[in-house]
From Swiss-Prot:
It comes from the Eukaryota. One of its GO terms (molecular function) is DNA replication origin binding. PANTHER family: ORIGIN RECOGNITION COMPLEX SUBUNIT 6. GO terms for cellular component: chromatin; cytosol; DNA replication preinitiation complex; nuclear origin of replication recognition complex; nuclear pre-replicative complex; nuclear replication fork; nucleus. GO terms for biological process: DNA replication initiation. Belongs to the ORC6 family. Keywords: DNA replication, DNA-binding, Nucleus. ORC is composed of six subunits. ORC interacts with cdc18, recruiting it to the ars1 origin of replication. It is found in: Nucleus. The keyword Nucleus applies. Component of the origin recognition complex (ORC) that binds origins of replication. It has a role in both chromosomal replication and mating type transcriptional silencing. ORC binds to multiple sites within the ars1 origin of DNA replication in an ATP-independent manner. This is Origin recognition complex subunit 6. It holds the Pfam family ORC6.
Length: 264
């Protein structure tokens, strides 16, 4: 539905004899439309402008690359009011537009993500995995999902963990960095696909030199904070034992209560 809304809006903004529009343009418009629903509330009377503004913003961002001639003769509401609404729409989504513009190149996106999350030594491995699966005709959101899946796989292998078990904390961080809206199931699907590639099998287990120490340095701890972190990690490791003990106690007290009830 969102895709069709963007295509309909593009027909009004960049009229052309062709019935097909650049896939990159459509995907970008879809991203703006989807994210605007979380970032920008509109009045009921203004809601019909949302897909139009998302398509308009995508056209503005890619006008030079795609040599687009933008035509705003058929705005959904009077032009003066529309321009005021669109200006605010741009401001709200400016962090997203800047990040998408800066990270349009896949390899740059990978470098950006890994560096942002403190795993720059993983960059070449993530790039290898992404190249193994991504094709030029893929939609932007699918490419972002693949990048995140590749990052999670490499990160897990570097720490010697179960590669196909999603670390949801890391996933959410990565998705936040790339403004990605893929579901956990979609990410997991791509992880399975990538794990079958020979590029993945060639990554050495625990073999990414400096990765673990680098990840630890990204958020330095000092003094009491460091002690709290270490204590937390120990407690986390002991959680299954603690849980079993608690459950055993609960069962014991339940049985005692049942005995008391029977005796009375």
């Amino acid at each position: 539905m969102e895709r069709q809304q963007i295509i309909e809006s593009l027909r009004r903004i960049i009229p052309t004899e062709s019935t097909e529009y650049n896939e990159r343009l459509i995907s970008l418009g879809e991203s703006f439309l989807e994210w605007s629903k979380y970032k920008h509330n509109l009045k009921a009377t203004e809601e019909l402008c949302r897909p139009y503004m998302a398509a308009h913003l995508a056209c503005e961002l890619l006008s030079n690359d795609l040599n687009l001639e933008i035509n705003l003769l058929a705005t959904p509401i009077p032009k003066k009011k529309y321009y005021k609404l669109f200006t605010y729409f741009q401001e709200i989504l400016s962090p997203l537009t800047k990040s998408l513009a800066a990270k349009d190149d896949l390899m740059e996106t990978i470098t950006y993500l890994c560096t942002k999350l403190g795993g720059s030594t993983a960059i070449p491995y993530v790039k290898q995995l992404v190249k193994a699966v991504v094709t030029n005709d893929m939609r932007i959101e699918h490419k972002r999902g693949i990048i995140i899946a590749a990052y999670l796989l490499v990160s897990a292998k570097a720490f010697g963990k179960d590669e196909l078990h999603i670390n949801h904390t890391e996933r959410r961080k990565a998705q936040s960095v790339l403004q990605d809206t893929s579901s956990a199931l979609q990410i997991q699907y791509w992880m399975h696909v990538l794990s079958e590639s020979w590029q993945y099998k060639e990554i050495p287990l625990n073999g990414i030199e400096g990765y673990e120490s680098q990840k630890q340095r990204i958020k330095p701890w000092s003094g009491i904070a460091s002690m709290i972190q270490i204590d937390y990690e120990k407690r986390l490791q002991n959680y299954p034992i603690w849980k079993a003990c608690i459950e055993e106690r609960i069962q014991y007290y339940k049985s005692q209560l049942e005995k008391d009830g029977t005796a009375s």
